[in-house]
Amino acid sequence: MVKRVAIVGAGVSGLASIKCCLEEGLEPTCFERSCDLGGLWRFTEHVEEGRASLYNSVVSNSSKEMSCYSDFPFPEDYPNFVPNSLFLEYLQLYATQFNLLRCIYFNTKVCSITKRPDFAVSGQWEVVTVCQGKQSSDTFDAVMVCTGFLTNPHLPLDSFPGIQTFKGQYFHSRQYKHPDVFKDKRVLVVGMGNSGTDIAVEASHLAKKVFLSTTGGAWVISRVFDSGYPWDMIFMTRFQNMLRNLLPTPVVSWLISKKMNSWFNHVNYGVAPEDRTQLREPVLNDELPGRIITGKVLIKPSIKEVKENSVVFNNTPKEEPIDVIVFATGYSFAFPFLDESIVKVEDGQASLYKYIFPAHLPKPTLAVIGLIKPLGSMIPTGETQARWVVQVLKGATTLPPPSVMMKEVNERKKNKHSGFGLCYCKALQSDYITYIDDLLTSINAKPDLRAMLLTDPRLALSIFFGPCTPYHFRLTGPGKWEGARKAILTQWDRTVNVTKTRTVQETPSTFETLLKLFSFLALLVAVFFIFL
């Protein structure tokens, strides 16, 4: 019988795991190696070992309605995309609201997690920690690892011939904090993920010249999408997700390409992804095309050679003088406190069932939360994982035999997506809505839209055609939240009200009213045929 649960890390997934354990009568003990909660979202001027690091200007890429905990919306006065300082404040509010701090031991490093001698029977773990030089050991019935994957920088210097001769400065993007370091310098940023693009844009305001080197390109979108709404509230809907999964791949690729190029022509700007047949994680940046068109950022192909004070790019013999190189080349994940046999990692891929449970263990009492890259927000993903894990630990949900789980893991590895950047953890990518629904189905928490269409059609239509906000995940099942329905039906109000800081008189026309009525009727007909 699982009772005591050790949780490693007090970031967004660790906090959710504590709350899920408490709600189901388990006894969580969370070990956080730093002095406070927040993980990635707690900015510090200096990089801390073993903790994710962010730069001072970081703003969330997911909007507040899409990236909140499923039963705890962001405060209404928060902007739609949240700066890191406010994001940390939100996490502190969450921890206070649900009394989570009492379960956290700060400044406590987990040294090792090993199986107890009777693990085959008990499934228990021995957890060794150290706090202020004092080592302790304790036994737990289960472990939830919530350390993320943004702590071990991937810096493949062997891939850049001549880097040892470079006399300028170079560092991984993990070390970046402020743009002052680029003042009056010639800067090269390697890697066109979110961090690399952000850093290149920031550098372009102070540097003499900025180059952004990319191997595979990327779709670049703004946080501000159709009609000024947040991109993910328009893009991440169950209806669109259904179309993306049902339509032929060439059709989906064409539609995505057309949509992505509606802001600017990616080919003309030199950033178009080489492989446009798959839906891949877009790069979120509101400024990049403006910096490119004004000559402040120059897009370049991969590096051919690094020299003492310059760089030669592929497909061009010209040497470009460079003072600073920033390697935004991603991260690798590791669990230094676990034996390699517990979480098996091969070719950058972890053998985790549903990205969570080590598939080979005879007892499913160790889970990894947040080791996934969904095309969606991390908070509701990690929270849903934690809810599912707790139900497994309680015995309310059962897992398949290890052989079946290993088969699914191996199939996933074969069908892995391709990602952005030089080192993107490909095996961690997942379709957000499909993945969440799969976990919710296992714990009987997925909303039944067919039944809801008869009992609450307004809510059903909002869920199917509207943004897939986390509140969907609390309408039913264990952890049901009574405020979920209201949160869904008022989500657009909260989105718009925060930007309406000046009242403008609207004058709707009769034509617009009739058009809306006709559209609504057409929508009802479409829904009727979809759910037949």
From Swiss-Prot:
Site annotation (Important for substrate binding): which residues? K208
This protein's GO cellular component annotations are: endoplasmic reticulum membrane
Tissues with expression: Expressed in liver, lung and kidney and to a lesser extent in the heart and brain.
Identify the Pfam families for this entry: FMO-like
Topology check: give the Lumenal ranges: 1-510
Q: Where in the cell is it found?
A: Endoplasmic reticulum membrane
Keywords, comma-separated and alphabetical: Endoplasmic reticulum, FAD, Flavoprotein, Membrane, Monooxygenase, NADP, Oxidoreductase, Transmembrane, Transmembrane helix
Q: Which cofactor does it need?
A: FAD
Q: What class of enzyme is it?
A: oxidoreductase
Q: Which residues lie on this side of the membrane: Cytoplasmic?
A: 532
Q: Which GO terms describe its biological process?
A: energy homeostasis; negative regulation of fatty acid oxidation; organic acid metabolic process; response to lipopolysaccharide; taurine biosynthetic process; toxin metabolic process; xenobiotic metabolic process
Q: Spell out the molecular function terms from Gene Ontology.
A: flavin adenine dinucleotide binding; hypotaurine monooxygenase activity; monooxygenase activity; N,N-dimethylaniline monooxygenase activity; NADP binding; trimethylamine monooxygenase activity
Asked whether the keyword Membrane is assigned, the reply is: yes
Topology within the bilayer = Single-pass membrane protein
Positions that bind FAD: G9, A10, G11, V12, S13, E32, L40, W41, N61, S62
Annotated catalysed reactions: hypotaurine + NADPH + O2 + H(+) = taurine + NADP(+) + H2O; hypotaurine + NADH + O2 + H(+) = taurine + NAD(+) + H2O; trimethylamine + NADPH + O2 = trimethylamine N-oxide + NADP(+) + H2O; N,N-dimethylaniline + NADPH + O2 + H(+) = N,N-dimethylaniline N-oxide + NADP(+) + H2O
The UniProt transmembrane annotation reads 511-531
Give the E.C. number(s).
1.14.13.148, 1.14.13.8
What role does this protein play? Broad spectrum monooxygenase that catalyzes the oxygenation of a wide variety of nitrogen- and sulfur-containing compounds including xenobiotics. Catalyzes the S-oxygenation of hypotaurine to produce taurine, an organic osmolyte involved in cell volume regulation as well as a variety of cytoprotective and developmental processes.
The family assignment reads: Belongs to the FMO family.
Name of this protein: Flavin-containing monooxygenase 1
Lineage per the UniProt record: Eukaryota, Metazoa, Chordata, Craniata, Vertebrata
